């Protein structure tokens, strides 16, 4: 699909227009000039004064037209004024595409990853729920159903973490272990098949211990508390029980006041990595929150996406984990996996019912740019928009019926049906780390391979991103440098605290 756009001369608007086009068409190119033929042409005209911006638009040759005006407030910065212009253009453009295609976008012009962050911001500024909801509807064209979902999640987050707006003086820590038994077809996380990598794993773990020691030392010196620790990857349980033991021992030795950290989670996503020895190690350090991710309860699907475990193994390892004291288990399901439709997804839900994990994350398949699945899209047959929407409706109904509540939400580019990923839990079993990472309310220090840090200014909320290299070889060569860089950022963020000591 090729759409020609007339009347837009600011390159900064190209990406938002492309993101909205992607909501309607899987393969879509936008052209801003030239004589190449296009499937259709959208003409946009912008009229701007000091007080307001008006955008008019039409799908040429169809009679479909739209116009919208937004006013600038007197105290707006240049950046805020540009955002107002961008949103006005997006408003008109979305309505033109909805009328032209007959497809309704329930998230309106929102294409960002964190919709609930927008609602948190409005409520924090002193707006009532009613005012905030009215603005989301009027300015962003978000439908009531999605606004209600956002509000339910915000309420649940504030119940789970009553001091959510005050945790900026603490940090959370993400520890990335980049190894897996095999790499899944949809995955773009740092994940390297662990077989035959013994030397590289050993070098990586040496660097990881170093990072933990230095970061922990700094946190202790400056009296900065840790809210949560999350071991992700990869699959952190891919390493041996002995390596896990040494790693958690380092965690207890290096980080401040570990026994009072609110939550420690270890992803054990691949059931084929879970053993009695590894569960005993988790027990030793009082870690009882893990993830075991079936993704699907169809063996054919697991084979197709490169997961070398069976449905039976998932169930067996779930029960083994329960027997060894794992009291807070999360499981993931993915809507829209290759070859799966409503029937297969309902089967996965009925299998989940037999286990009743404390939390269930329902992902919608996303075609991530660097994944094997995206590179070879022709090999993977996936469900259409309507069927994917039906599966999401089934997930919403099933979770409600079984006492689960939504507590976090995020969206991705190129996600099937422009839907969302929702984390559900039984009340009181929410993952605090997931809330922290989604709502961006505190600094998160990323340690290990591919680990992304977010340094959040405690006064302005400005976010500075910093990432460790994704591949173990690069990490092993320069982990000292990356540790030093993170400590510099921490010193900037906690400058006032630093000066007091």
Curated annotation (Swiss-Prot):
Question: What InterPro entries has UniProt attached to this entry?
Answer: Coproporphyrinogen-III_oxidase, Elp3/MiaA/NifB-like_rSAM, HemZ, rSAM, rSAM_horseshoe
GO terms for cellular component:
cytoplasm
Expression induction per the record is: Induced under anaerobic conditions and by hydrogen peroxide stress. It is also dependent on induction by ResDE, Fnr and ArfM.
Enzymatic class? oxidoreductase
Tell me which residues make up the Radical SAM core domain.
Answer: 163-405
Q: Which family does it belong to?
A: Belongs to the anaerobic coproporphyrinogen-III oxidase family. HemZ subfamily.
Question: Which protein, by its recorded name, is this?
Answer: Oxygen-independent coproporphyrinogen-III oxidase-like protein HemZ
This protein's gene is called: hemZ
């Amino acid at each position: 699909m090729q759409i020609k756009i007339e009347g837009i001369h600011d390159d900064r608007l190209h990406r938002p227009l492309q993101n909205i086009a992607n909501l309607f068409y899987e393969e879509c190119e936008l052209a801003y000039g030239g004589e190449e033929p296009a499937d259709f042409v959208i003409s946009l005209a912008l009229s701007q004064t000091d007080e307001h911006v008006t955008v008019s638009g039409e799908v040429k040759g169809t009679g479909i037209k739209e116009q919208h005006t937004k006013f600038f407030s007197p105290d707006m910065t240049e950046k805020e004024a540009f955002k107002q212009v961008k949103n006005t253009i997006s408003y008109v453009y979305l309505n033109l595409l909805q009328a032209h295609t007959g497809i309704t976008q329930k998230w309106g012009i929102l294409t960002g990853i964190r919709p609930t962050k927008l609602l948190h911001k409005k409520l924090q500024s002193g707006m009532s729920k009613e005012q905030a909801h009215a603005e989301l509807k009027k300015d962003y064209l978000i439908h009531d159903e999605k606004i209600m979902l956002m509000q339910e999640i915000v309420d649940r987050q504030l119940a789970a973490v009553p001091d959510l707006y005050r945790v900026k003086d603490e940090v959370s820590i993400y520890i990335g272990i980049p190894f897996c038994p095999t790499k899944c077809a949809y995955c773009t996380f740092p994940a390297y098949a662990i077989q035959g990598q013994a030397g590289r794993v050993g070098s990586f773990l040496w660097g990881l211990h170093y990072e933990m020691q230095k970061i922990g030392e700094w946190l202790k010196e400056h009296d900065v508390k840790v809210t949560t620790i999350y071991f992700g990857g990869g699959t952190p349980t891919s390493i041996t029980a002995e390596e896990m033991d040494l790693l958690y021992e380092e965690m207890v030795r290096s980080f401040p006041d570990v026994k009072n950290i609110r939550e420690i989670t270890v992803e054990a996503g691949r059931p084929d990595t879970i053993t009695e020895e590894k569960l005993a190690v988790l027990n030793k350090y009082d870690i009882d929150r893990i993830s075991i991710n079936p993704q699907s309860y169809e063996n054919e699907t697991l084979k197709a996406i490169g997961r070398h475990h069976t449905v039976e193994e998932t169930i067996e390892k779930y029960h083994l984990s329960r027997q060894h004291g794992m009291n807070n288990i999360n499981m993931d399901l993915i809507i829209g996996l290759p070859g799966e439709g409503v029937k297969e997804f309902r089967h996965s839900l009925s299998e989940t019912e037999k286990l009743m994990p404390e939390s269930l994350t329902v992902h919608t398949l996303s075609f991530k740019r660097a994944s094997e699945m995206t590179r070879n899209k022709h090999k993977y047959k996936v469900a259409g928009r309507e069927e994917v929407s039906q599966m999401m409706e089934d997930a919403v109904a099933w979770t409600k019926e079984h006492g689960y509540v939504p507590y976090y939400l995020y969206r991705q580019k190129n996600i099937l049906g422009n839907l969302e990923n929702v984390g559900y839990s039984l009340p009181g079993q929410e993952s605090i780390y997931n809330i922290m990472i989604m709502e961006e309310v505190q600094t998160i220090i990323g340690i290990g391979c591919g680990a992304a840090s977010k340094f959040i200014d405690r006064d302005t909320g400005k976010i500075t991103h910093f990432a460790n290299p994704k591949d173990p070889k690069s990490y092993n060569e320069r982990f000292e440098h990356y540790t030093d860089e993170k400590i510099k950022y921490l010193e900037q963020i906690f400058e006032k605290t630093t000066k007091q000591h």
